Amino acid sequence: MNPINSFIFPDIPKDLGKILMKDDQQLIVVGIIGKSSTPDCNKLVGFNLLTIHPALTDTDPRDGRVKFYFENDGKILYLHFETTFDQHVMADLLAKAVQTGIQDNFINFNSTVRTRFARVLLFAIQVCHMIVLVEPSSVFDTSYLSIFKSLKIIREKYVLKFLPKLLKSSNLGNYMGKEARLCSPRFIFFFEGTSNIKPEDVEKLDGLECSVEEEIYKMLRNEFIITNNSAMSLFSIPRSKKFVFYNSDKRAKSNPLADSIDLLMKYLNKPAGGQNDDDEDLMSRLRPYDGYGMSAWSVGKSKRAEKKERSILALLKEHVAEAFEHGFDDSASKYRGRGHFVIPSFKTWYEGFKLLHKIFIDNPSNSSYETNDPDYKAFLQNFHKIIDIDERFFAEICEHGLELAMVNYKDMLPHHYSSTFHEKKYEQAHELFTRYARGPEVERHEQKLKDYCDSIWLNGKQQCEYPSLRGNPCALGKHKVKDPTEHSSGVIFVSACNCGRTQGHREDPYTIRQGNYDFYQIIAKSCSSCNVLERVKFPVFEPSSNDFRAAEFINKNLSNLMSFEHSNRTPDASTHPPMTNENSPHLSGSQKSQDSASNLTFSMDEKRDEENKSQKFGTQGEDEDETLEQETVNEIVIKVGEHSEDKAILRQPSTTEYLPGMLHAASPAGLLPQFPSWSLVCLGPSSIYTHNSGIPEHVQSGFLSGANFLLPWDVSVRLEHAQSWAASYEKIRNRKKNTSQPKSSESSNTFTLKIFLGVEYECLRGHRFIMSGPDTVLRGGSGSIVRDSGSKVVFNDMPIYFPCPCRSSNIAQLMRVHVVTPKAPVNVIVEPKVRILQGTTQNCLTFTTGLTEPIKLSQSAYWILRLPFIYEGDSGPLMPPAGVTVANAATHGVLMAGMFGIRESEISEELL
């Protein structure tokens, strides 16, 4: 029989059971727990107690396993606990967790390791008189403090409530008393780590142990793990004996196989000679255990002389001797004598041990176990929560970060806000949350933050966000509307009225009617001129009954529209007369009415060609007050044509269906909109405008400095058939001048007209300016005369959108065309066409006024044509572009060239 016996609970051999349970044998129970770094996980190696090194056995360690060790004639029962703090047990647990995917992060895994170790440690505290905490290193692991503190809380809050009841009901463990344990167990701290102190230097080792004892005692006292009353402490610390031991014997960490091979080689290499005491000692060290290769009789009779040496086993025996003699009472003098200490027989103790093992180890490991005792149930449910300080720490910092993030999100919230603002506020709150949150609870708290922010936004804070025709979202709360006009973005623009005299605030439009008609009707009430000025009426839908609706159609003319756009023609030649470029160097145009027509064309020629009867455009410059620089003068040939026999066949507009959008070149014939998007008013006589000072501020407000001048356009008109009205015109003209000087035939047929034009742009802040060309803003100095020619705007496409020269980098839109007609027996005609490009030049719409003929303006008058604020095609409104620059302005939309023309008028003396 080996000097020391062992077995693994609960498999106790019969022969060992008889030995332990004979004569009511009493034993001091010493628990061995802590950490180990060897594959066998046996922490008794450093005690020099084992006869066979654990490395030579084939037993695999397992979490929660308890192994009993005792000597036949000894008084100590060693309980060796294998826990998750043993390195190889932890490695096996980690391998299983990775394989099964149960633990998704290290924090959860570490929490599981700590919880399982704490269960075993609490169980050891209940069944042991002494506990040796083994540490492989030379430094105390302060992470034990949190486990000790948590176990003290668990014991006081739960264990002392349910355990006495369970022991009493089972008639087992009555010897444990009210404390439900043998005693307040003494803790011995055993450090296996080698220090720099040599084993021979005992004084330094003792000094190190004393200093470590003081530090450990202070830490345990500061955390209230031990108190003056040991009965109220988790465990006790001896007051007059050592409780810290540093192992200086290197054999505790030796590898027996490697050491045996080294010793064998050393013995074989030794020179031949007689055997001595050193050889005997060498041979004994080669044996795997004491007595190996010797007879049982010699082993029993030959006992080694016990040497007085420094060992952990000697220290334990001192404490055991005190336990048998007086028991442990480590309380202060005030509480001394009140502690509970009992040494039961092994049989009695073992029955209680089995019950406590089931309560503290087996039942918590069984996930399906249920108990009727509420205190025990609370213990099972809350054990992990209390022990797991890491998860609690990370949960608390996540909660703290979550609270700060919630406050940050709620701070200065508007009454309603958009999804973009919501996401921005959430990102700010989430950024603040991530400054604090750590650990496995981050994702769960992130979802809580997301749900919280979403709930606030969706519960009465959600903004409607329905976009306006200018792209601004509705600022009202989420609401259901019957009409788009119920939306409001809260954005206010500044715009002028139809005549341009009055500026006012306008709301961001949500319908074409709001943008192109309603605003101008409202502001007209504030304007002193709009409602009294002469105006041109544009065709609109006039229902014949109350039963009318918007037309539903598929734009079959879309392909025709694309082809006609590039040839500057309209699809319907009968309703829109084409502007064609003929072989003649002069541009010719046609005037149509229901009874007669006259052809009219414009052209610029560089050479005089008698065969083609062409004339070169002359350059003249004159003004009533000052002389302008020489500029190109355009010559217009007016031909008086014959009366047309056939009248144009015009389709009558529908009186039951209206056009839902705006009129454009491809709109179905016979459909008209419900309201006009254009406006043409006569501001008054031409004398309103003086070229020396520009447009007066009281007539047109909001113009930028130097950009309030119209451009002069000098046009030379030649009569090809003077007999129609030239004779009477000259007669009246000579009479006015009181002269009878005859003129040549050529000079009597040519007239020079001065027409003042202005293409006005207006930004959303109300800034207005005239442009002198497709890419140039007019810059007229104070007191000087603008010398730019109007021909640039007449014969070029003018962009609809252009960067405003103001500081705010707004986009200005072409909103008005100013025309000051001359005092001459001709009429200026206008036929505006706006081409809006949608992405490419192959996808565009040409918007028209809907009139079947060009508009004839009266002589010697100031006319203003107001263009639409919003454009809408058959598929819906066309959003104004963003990022307009001088270089790309013409790619978004243009007012097409060829808008202006000249027609003859009846001659009367009042015109001169």
Swiss-Prot record:
Keyword Kinase: no
Protein name: Nonsense-mediated mRNA decay factor SMG8
A GO biological process held by the record: nuclear-transcribed mRNA catabolic process, nonsense-mediated decay
Keyword vocabulary terms for this entry: Nonsense-mediated mRNA decay
Region (Disordered): 565-630
Keyword flag Transmembrane helix: no
The protein's role, per its UniProt record: Involved in nonsense-mediated decay (NMD) of mRNAs containing premature stop codons. Probable component of kinase complex containing SMG1 and recruited to stalled ribosomes.
InterPro entries: SMG8-like
Biased composition (Basic and acidic residues): 604-614
Composition bias, Polar residues: 570-602
